[in-house]
């Protein structure tokens, strides 16, 4: 059976993926404990930045304790900064390989992130390359 928190999490992810200003009625009923669980789910699925992007400006989020809001925002921003840095490093490495005449085929990571409306909000831990 899917919980209220999981239902809210899925609604938030759907709102992120569709870039629609969703009517997130599921958030209104969440307790602080459920909000914490929602953020844990988001972190487990590497979607904390995406979830924060959707909920960060909602009245429901504004009602959470300052420390929780600050913690979620900090973790989301750190994730984004780390991803931007990893992406820049990857692009530099890819360019160097191409200058050496090596044409790598990017298998996932940056390619999969490009499917998201805001790719830097979906971190990837590594980039898989096929080098012929």
What do the PLM-derived regions correspond to, one by one?
Residues 2-7, 18-108:
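Helical scaffold of the NTase/Pol beta-like nucleotidyltransferase catalytic core
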Residues 61, 116-117:
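Short Asp/Glu-rich motifs
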């Amino acid at each position: 059976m899917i919980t209220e928190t999981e239902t809210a999490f899925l609604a938030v992810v759907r709102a992120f993926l569709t870039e629609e200003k969703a009517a997130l009625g599921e958030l209104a009923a969440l307790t602080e404990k459920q909000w914490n669980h929602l953020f844990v789910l988001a972190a487990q699925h590497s979607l904390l930045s995406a979830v924060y992007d959707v909920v960060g400006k909602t009245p429901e989020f504004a009602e959470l304790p300052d420390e929780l809001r600050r913690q979620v925002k900090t973790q989301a921003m750190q994730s984004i900064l780390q991803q931007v840095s990893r992406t820049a490093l990857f692009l530099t490495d890819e360019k160097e390989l191409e200058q050496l005449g090596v044409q790598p085929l990017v298998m996932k990571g940056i390619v999969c992130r490009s499917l998201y409306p805001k790719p830097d909000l979906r971190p990837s831990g590594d980039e898989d390359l096929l080098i012929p």
